[in-house]
Amino acid sequence: MRSIMVQSAKTDSVNQQTIEGLKLQIKKLNSKAGQLKMDLHDLAEGLPIDYQNLTALAAETYEIYRHLDELKSQLKSLEKNHDMGY
């Protein structure tokens, strides 16, 4: 019984570290995503000047937001499992 409790405490600690790590990653990506969004907006406002950069910047912005969405889904799942005691 004691072994199960120790293992559960270790798992809980690992899950909490994972959750905190994901939150930190999300915070950093949110900042970068916001900057890319502003850059994309500025580029769009200046069109047709620098139109050659539009595709690359849009792709980078898309990829950041896709990754951010993926991390948020992982975080939500981990928090749900953590709250349920898994």
UniProtKB/Swiss-Prot annotation:
Note whether Transferase occurs among the keywords: no
A biological process term (GO) from this entry: nitrogen fixation
Q: One Pfam family this chain carries?
A: Rop-like
The record's Gene3D superfamilies line, in alphabetical order, gives: Helix hairpin bin (1.10.287.660)
InterPro entries per record = Helix_hairpin_bin_sf (IPR029012), Put_N_fixation (IPR007774)
Q: Which UniProt keywords apply?
A: Nitrogen fixation
What family does this chain come from, according to its entry? Belongs to the UPF0437 family.
Query: What is the official name of this protein in its record?
Result: UPF0437 protein Ava_4254
Q: Which organism does this record belong to?
A: Trichormus variabilis (strain ATCC 29413 / PCC 7937) (Anabaena variabilis)
